[in-house]
Amino acid sequence: MESLTLQPIARVDGAINLPGSKSVSNRALLLAALACGKTVLTNLLDSDDVRHMLNALSALGINYTLSADRTRCDITGNGGALRAPGALELFLGNAGTAMRPLAAALCLGQNEIVLTGEPRMKERPIGHLVDSLRQGGANIDYLEQENYPPLRLRGGFTGGEIEVDGSVSSQFLTALLMTAPLAPEDTTIRVKGELVSKPYIDITLNLMKTFGVEIANHHYQQFVVKGGQQYHSPGRYLVEGDASSASYFLAAGAIKGGTVKVTGIGRKSMQGDIRFADVLEKMGATITWGDDFIACTRGELHAIDMDMNHIPDAAMTIATTALFAKGTTTLRNIYNWRVKETDRLFAMATELRKVGAEVEEGHDYIRITPPAKLHHADIGTYNDHRMAMCFSLVALSDTPVTILDPKCTAKTFPDYFEQLARMSTPA
């Protein structure tokens, strides 16, 4: 297996313009494909997940052109539901941001489509979404294991009264919200359980509004969507920087700044993960906000005990930042780590112990006490981009760290290690 050893880093300083947000990129691509008119998307993320979405749209007859660096996409909308040219199988890798929204959107009208992906995708639950789509008339079969992909979709979704479980993934609700305006009937969606990652629903609602569709949101417990609507292209749309990707650089500034400035997100960003900067501030770093930047300056870091339900992806970065904080850090209400690219709670606990931390892994929390001195270890990444990027921070100590399968960052940030090296002064 390929590996990358990062030598100790004495200081991190400078600025980075972030690659486009994965969450925003794939939502914007799907809405542009469903919309009337031509949309020009700029600062699109070039990553595995986005390529899977683009390949799927292409197979569904959507025409688009990409710039040489794949960050600009000119896409001609279908002016309504996507139509398969015949029976079709779409391979979506391990891209939840493609699988969940497409599973819903392709239930409009009459299609015969199989959605499948990598072995890990077949372990990521989708039953709550399928249950909700069936309530709206969708005809869906599980081809292997009940409640998991691959799925066969045969259209039939018409809207109506729908319940969705919000406790596992907000992507299920996102998928229903984006599809419902194109259904022939009005749709009322009721959320059961505590809605996880609520800020990701705000991204969805924000983008739908950009494409001309507004819905009634009753305290995130009930959403009322008029049927028979159309999305309309906004013309040009700039994809903001990825706030989850910003977390590694901001944390590096907190631990070994200097000052690190990330551009492409700021106080006006729609992504909930910008709140990660508030957590660093609580730990002792100094944060400066602009409209399109966030800067972080080193401080003496102290442990925290916090509910992280609102920023589950960026919260992973706090788990490795905790190695540099005084005291025991507890991250709570993070059960949905277990249904991401890997079981992130298990993976994080396992790898933190390798570098010497004392770790308590609970059903939905993790408690981390740093060692006096970090140990050099080979870090398993579990084909999970965020594991690789989180554990790069170990090099901000006087100990090297070896990252196994470093190329897994291609899911959201293909040149992550080059960018980190560019801003780092070796010890």
UniProtKB/Swiss-Prot annotation:
One of its GO terms (biological process) is amino acid biosynthetic process. It is an enzyme of class 2 (transferase). Its main location: cytoplasm. The active site is at D313 (proton acceptor). Its EC number is 2.5.1.19. Keywords: Amino-acid biosynthesis, Aromatic amino acid biosynthesis, Cytoplasm, Transferase. Phosphoenolpyruvate binds at K22, G96, R124, Q171, R344, R386, K411. 3-phosphoshikimate binds at K22, S23, R27, S169, S170, Q171, S197, D313, N336, K340. InterPro entries: Enolpyruvate_Tfrase_dom, Enolpyruvate_Tfrase_sf, EPSP_synthase, EPSP_synthase_CS, RNA3'P_cycl/enolpyr_Trfase_a/b. It comes from the Bacteria. Pathway: Metabolic intermediate biosynthesis; chorismate biosynthesis; chorismate from D-erythrose 4-phosphate and phosphoenolpyruvate: step 6/7. The keyword Transferase applies. It is found in: Cytoplasm. One of its GO terms (cellular component) is cytoplasm. GO terms for molecular function: 3-phosphoshikimate 1-carboxyvinyltransferase activity. It catalyses: 3-phosphoshikimate + phosphoenolpyruvate = 5-O-(1-carboxyvinyl)-3-phosphoshikimate + phosphate. Monomer. Belongs to the EPSP synthase family. Catalyzes the transfer of the enolpyruvyl moiety of phosphoenolpyruvate (PEP) to the 5-hydroxyl of shikimate-3-phosphate (S3P) to produce enolpyruvyl shikimate-3-phosphate and inorganic phosphate. This is 3-phosphoshikimate 1-carboxyvinyltransferase. It comes from Salmonella schwarzengrund (strain CVM19633).
